[in-house]
């Protein structure tokens, strides 16, 4: 089990990304628009740089929903390999069958 502070920090980042996403998208669109004057684009770059670092989606870590494990996660299930194996052996993941040949 991961530290609760690490899990909570990641959840806080997720909330911050969700709240700041529209503003970041607007600023990025202004920066990418080559028809606008350079001063306006540079001002948008400065505003984007002033925003909190944790409002960037890159800072969010994919963690297991059950254990909070930060590594070896399946994006589709949002579970770590260990949690997926445990749930699969209990028959709680539909379509997951133990391999044998």
UniProtKB/Swiss-Prot annotation:
Organism annotation: Bradyrhizobium diazoefficiens (strain JCM 10833 / BCRC 13528 / IAM 13628 / NBRC 14792 / USDA 110)
Assembly and oligomerization: Part of the 30S ribosomal subunit. Contacts proteins S3 and S10.
Pfam families tied to this protein: Ribosomal_S14 (PF00253)
Region (Disordered): 1-23
HAMAP family listed in its UniProt record: Ribosomal_uS14_1
UniProt keyword annotation of Ribosomal protein present: yes
Protein family according to the UniProt entry: Belongs to the universal ribosomal protein uS14 family.
Molecular functions per Gene Ontology: rRNA binding; structural constituent of ribosome
Gene Ontology BP terms: translation
Protein name: Small ribosomal subunit protein uS14
Record's keyword annotation contains Kinase: no
Function description: Binds 16S rRNA, required for the assembly of 30S particles and may also be responsible for determining the conformation of the 16S rRNA at the A site.
InterPro entries tied to this protein: Ribosomal_uS14 (IPR001209), Ribosomal_uS14_bac/plastid (IPR023036)
Keyword terms of this UniProt record: Ribonucleoprotein, Ribosomal protein, RNA-binding, rRNA-binding
Coiled-coil region: none
One GO CC term on file: small ribosomal subunit
Ranges annotated as biased composition (Basic and acidic residues): 1-10
